[in-house]
């Protein structure tokens, strides 16, 4: 989801995020319930648009979001981003000897470098929703997007499952190229934390 998104940008309710990280846990010597986790991995996100498109390959001074309510449009249209990231967490586990059966909590931050931005469109339709062709179009271009990001994270759970939240502190777009959009995510995590 996007915080700061103008009302003129019509996104569908939920996007899809997949994050995979390999992390190492370093328990405190003075208190085994606390530890620091550091690692590296990939974070990706997809935002879906309702009768809209994003002109990431355009030549305009700002990123253009097109409203296609009364025009030809694609049945499915998404904007996807991917980052290589380095997360750092401060972790708490209620019972360090049985971490797979105890309460856990973590707060942290991630720094990331943008490795991919693309749009993908499937099945062109007329303004009434009738299928015109079953084509797929994919466009890659990074010029409007910040190449680095900083995100704050939090997790709380039991055993290997937890609820997860992330808020991107830096804007999605470069300064001056559009609205200050800050993505945020909520979801489920499978982890050995």
Regions from the language model: what does each represent?
Residues 34-40, 84-86, 103-111, 152-154, ...:
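Transmembrane beta-strands of outer-membrane beta-barrel proteins
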Residues 136-193:
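Predominantly the C-terminal beta-signal and adjacent terminal strand-loop region
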Residues 5-13, 47-58, 62-81, 114-126, ...:
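Extracellular/periplasm-exposed beta-strand and loop segments of Gram-negative cell-envelope proteins
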Residues 23-27, 77, 89-93, 153-157, ...:
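Transmembrane beta-barrel domains of outer membrane proteins
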């Amino acid at each position: 989801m996007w915080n700061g998104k103008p009302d003129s940008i019509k996104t569908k309710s939920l996007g899809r995020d997949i994050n995979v990280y390999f992390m190492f846990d370093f328990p405190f010597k003075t208190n085994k319930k606390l530890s620091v986790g550091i690692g590296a991995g990939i974070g990706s996100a997809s935002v879906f648009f309702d009768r809209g498109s994003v002109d990431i390959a355009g030549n305009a001074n700002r990123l253009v979001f097109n409203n296609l309510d009364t025009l030809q449009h694609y049945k499915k249209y998404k904007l996807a981003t991917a980052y290589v990231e380095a997360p750092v967490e401060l972790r708490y586990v209620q019972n360090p000897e049985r971490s797979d059966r105890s309460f856990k909590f973590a707060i942290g931050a991630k720094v990331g470098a943008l490795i991919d931005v693309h749009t993908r469109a499937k099945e062109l339709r007329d303004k009434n929703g009738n299928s015109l062709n079953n084509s797929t179009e994919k466009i890659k271009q990074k010029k409007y997007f910040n190449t680095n990001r900083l995100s704050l994270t939090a997790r709380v759970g039991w055993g290997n499952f937890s609820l997860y939240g992330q808020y991107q502190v830096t804007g999605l777009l470069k300064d001056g190229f559009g609205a200050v959009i800050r993505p945020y995510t909520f979801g489920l995590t499978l982890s050995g934390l």
